[in-house]
Swiss-Prot record:
Function: Irreversibly catalyzes the reduction of fumarate to succinate.
GO biological process, one term: fumarate metabolic process
Gene name of the record: osm1
EC number: 1.3.1.6
Top EC class, one word: oxidoreductase
Keyword RNA-binding: no
Gene Ontology molecular-function annotations: FMN binding; fumarate reductase (NADH) activity
The name this protein goes by in its record: Fumarate reductase
Active site: H288, R311
Pfam families given in the database record: FAD_binding_2
InterPro entries given in the database record: FAD-dep_OxRdtase_2_FAD-bd, FAD-oxidoreductase_2, FAD/NAD-bd_sf, Flavocytochrome_c, Succ_DH/fumarate_Rdtase_cat_sf
Domain of life from the UniProt record: Eukaryota
Length: 513
């Protein structure tokens, strides 16, 4: 059973309270599930999707075994600092932003292009507001700043404004609270890191999953555990091995660096494929236009992402001749495509007002040596252009921002202006990088994994980047974290229902025997 949320016209939330009988039922269920054998869910992956599923199951009274092959939880989610999309929200209302589920959905459909799956995008967008509410109310996250990222027609990307935010993205809060819960409630939640799942346990027809086998990497011991399974193992954009899905489906991408952690190797995809699970669009990989070039290690295989929030605040992309070449807030595939046509380096440039708006990001990137403050003379030297050439670029941009002329590249939202030669600039070199695998395991709108014949595989759920098809050909910035929460919660609800159904079936069988 779910708690519903009713919105008044001011979007202020009024809770719908379950009946006393419902509360009693869940209390009884929690007791029964905690004392029965094999009544746990197994969540694989400790990123935002896995943590969302885990905490949803715990809230519904279930027990969880949380496995992660890494030595720390968080996955790629702890790198995501631009924020999470949602519409409509109280924060948008307070800031007089007119947005809706339909507007968000339409933006997402346009971005997804021919590969759009309307039913999944409708699920994603319609549950976005409740996802942000859940993060705020369940974990105390303060989402009090809005950004307009590339491809969005309204500011709808929510993030916090804590001074340490780039160092503590929202996933860190879930990691911390989940680990504390495990320490205080070991009967409800067990966590095992350094645990690599090697096989899904199924019936002979592969249409029912009832557990997994995993290896403890610290001592190489093998273990078998039982329960419905939630796969939240991430994508495969860091797998450069000979048997990688990248090499098999998108080999040209292997020449690029990645923003992904080394744990993103498609393990979950391969396990699902081995039991006849369906996949979709494995050849589609999102190449993000702005990965920082580290001056200390320019050819590094792993690069830091230059968050899209920088361009949202007003950053421009300039060639080594001091010229713009694209709408900086166009879709990611468009900006990347324009960059790849160039023969010269590209620099991300913020004026002082834009840098102030994203000051915590700038602080972090500057600390890492990825960005540098400079005056116009040094900027011209860096770009290998004259002051007159830079002044011409700035003048055209400022006039377009004022509405005096159309922008040459169609940019509509300009952020902090004007750009002036007397200002101080924050600058970093950027290149396209592997960022997100669009393809993955095929699920329905309840996060249930489907077989190649289109049927639901009982007891197997997936959420996060392992899931394919949600974002079509091109993902909007801020929608990856949203998909983790929305489909993570759905997977958690599904795993809880499966535990209940199997518990009742087991109890009935025992009683009749």
């Amino acid at each position: 059973m779910r708690c519903l949320t009713i919105y008044t016209w001011t979007f202020r939330r009024l809770p719908f309270i379950p009946s006393t009988n419902s509360a009693s039922f869940f209390s009884t269920l929690r007791f029964n599930m905690s004392t029965a054998n094999n009544t746990q869910a197994i969540v694989i992956g400790g990123g935002l999707a896995g943590l969302s599923a885990t905490n949803t199951i715990l809230d519904l009274g279930g027990n969880v075994l949380l496995l992660d092959k890494n030595t720390a939880f968080g996955g790629n989610s702890v790198k995501a600092a631009s924020g999470i999309n949602a519409a409509p929200t109280q924060l948008q209302f307070d800031q007089h932003v007119s947005d809706s589920v339909n507007t968000f959905y339409n933006d997402s459909i346009l971005s997804a292009k021919s590969k759009a799956k309307p039913e999944l995008l409708r699920t994603l967008t319609s549950k976005s507001s409740s996802a942000v509410d859940w993060l705020s109310e369940r974990f105390g996250l303060q989402m009090d700043q809005l950004s307009r990222l590339a491809g969005h027609s309204e500011p709808r990307t929510h993030r916090g404004t804590h001074p340490d935010y780039p160092f503590k993205p929202l996933a860190f809060v879930l990691v911390d609270q989940t680990e504390k819960f495990a320490a205080s409630h070991p009967d409800r939640l067990q966590i095992k890191k350094n645990a690599r799942v090697t096989r899904l346990l199924t019936n002979p027809n592969h249409d029912k999953v009832f557990g997994v086998e995993y290896m403890d990497l610290s001592d190489k011991s093998n273990h078998t555990v039982y329960g419905p399974v939630v796969l939240a193992t991430g994508g495969y954009a860091a797998d450069y091995s000979d048997d990688s899905l990248l090499k098999l489906y998108h080999p040209e991408a292997l020449s690029l660096s990645t923003t992904n952690g080394p744990y993103c190797t498609g393990d979950g995809h391969k396990m699902v494929m081995s039991i006849g699970g369906s996949t979709v669009d494995l050849d589609l990989v999102q190449i993000h236009p702005t990965g920082f070039v580290d001056p200390k290690d320019p050819t590094a295989l792993t690069k830091f992402l230059a968050a899209e929030a920088l361009r949202g605040s007003g950053a421009v992309l300039l060639t080594s001749q001091g010229r713009r070449f694209c709408d900086e807030l166009g879709y990611r595939d468009y900006v990347t495509g324009e960059m790849m046509k160039l023969k010269s380096p590209v620099y991300l440039v913020l004026n002082s007002a834009a840098a102030e708006e994203v000051a915590n990001f700038i602080k972090f990137y500057s600390f890492k040596g990825l960005m540098k403050k400079m005056k116009a003379e040094e900027l011209c030297s860096t770009l290998n252009c004259t002051k007159d050439e830079l002044a011409s670029t700035f003048s055209e941009y400022n006039r377009a921002a004022k509405g005096e002329i159309p922008d040459e590249f169609g940019r509509k939202y300009f952020g902090k202006t004007p750009l002036e030669l007397t200002d101080t600039f924050t600058v970093g070199e950027v290149v396209p990088v592997l960022h997100y695998t669009m393809g993955g395991v095929q699920v329905d709108t309840q996060s249930r994994v489907l077989s190649t014949n289109g049927n639901v595989i009982d007891g197997l759920f997936a959420a996060g980047e392992i899931v394919g098809g949600i974002h079509g050909e091109n993902r909007l910035g801020g929608s990856s974290l949203l998909a983790c929460v929305v489909f993570g919660r759905l997977a958690g609800q599904g795993a809880s229902s499966t535990m209940l159904r199997r518990f009742i079936a087991s109890s009935t069988s025992t009683a009749s025997s």
